């Protein structure tokens, strides 16, 4: 696999990668066991080293978050700095101008977006109208289920959402119990970059409030998953009943500090009211 263009030392591939290429599987994840090589310590010193050896032109990347909530901003910035191009991004939205996945749109590194709500990014609309960006729109629930199905190894499913609309054009329609359903194919990605509130060194993740959003399902649907976390603790510290994403789905972790809490929309009363 081509190396990242970031000038950093590659800490070495996980156990599921050999001879500088990813082992090919038709569906689902490559693997998630680093026990032999890293003694289950999946923590990398920074985003550069965590993504080293994983990035290439034309790859498909899932990015967690909803708006600017729960986005892996350090990892996204590192993808931008790597210079990879022709990317297909799977994300609920495209960030905003100057933040989130909007950074990758500004540098014209994205070829296609598989998304749901994109109305907050003016550049996104401009690129689409100029024919410089391919878009695959999805109802939001359908997008989430396509990702969940990909992580579960389910190749496709039927849903009533979108029947009789542009969403259903070119897709198989079937009758079940007198109701029409459209077939949707599942989604998997070469790489999933996600954000979590807390993790232990074995990759068990806890999300905080609405920042959970698309992160858990994307963790399962990436052939390689890299998590950006706010708090890092030792194994055994997190109550098993509180774990949202088990470590088996996480390959690499970075402890992200000095994160900026961005407010997408702020509405307050006028002074004196």
Feature annotation, model-predicted:
Residues 34-273:
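Conserved alpha/beta enzyme-core scaffold
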């Amino acid at each position: 696999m081509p190396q990242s263009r970031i000038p950093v030392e590659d800490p070495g591939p996980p156990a599921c990668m050999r001879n500088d290429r990813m082992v090919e599987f038709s569906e689902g994840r490559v693997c998630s066991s680093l026990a032999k090589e890293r003694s289950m310590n999946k923590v990398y010193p920074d985003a550069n080293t965590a993504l080293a050896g994983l990035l290439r032109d034309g790859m498909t990347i899932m990015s967690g978050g909803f708006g600017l909530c729960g986005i892996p901003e350090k990892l996204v910035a590192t993808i931008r700095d790597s210079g990879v191009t022709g990317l297909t991004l799977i994300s609920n939205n495209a960030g905003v101008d100057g933040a989130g996945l909007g950074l990758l749109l500004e540098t014209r590194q994205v070829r296609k977006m598989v998304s749901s709500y994109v109305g907050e990014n003016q550049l996104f609309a401009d690129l689409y109208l100029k024919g410089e960006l391919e878009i695959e729109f999805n109802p939001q629930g359908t997008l989430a289920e396509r990702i969940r199905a990909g992580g579960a190894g389910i190749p496709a499913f039927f849903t009533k959402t979108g029947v009789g609309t542009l969403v259903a054009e070119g897709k198989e329609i079937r009758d079940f119990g007198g109701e029409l359903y459209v077939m949707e194919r599942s989604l998997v990605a070469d790489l999933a970059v996600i954000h979590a509130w807390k993790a232990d060194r074995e990759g068990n993740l806890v999300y905080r409030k609405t920042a959970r959003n698309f992160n858990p399902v994307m963790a399962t649907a990436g052939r390689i998953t890299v998590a950006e976390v706010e708090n890092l603790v030792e194994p055994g510290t997190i109550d098993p009943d509180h774990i949202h994403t088990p470590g088996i789905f996480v390959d690499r972790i970075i402890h992200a500090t000095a994160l900026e809490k961005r407010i997408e929309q702020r509405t307050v009363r006028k002074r004196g009211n």
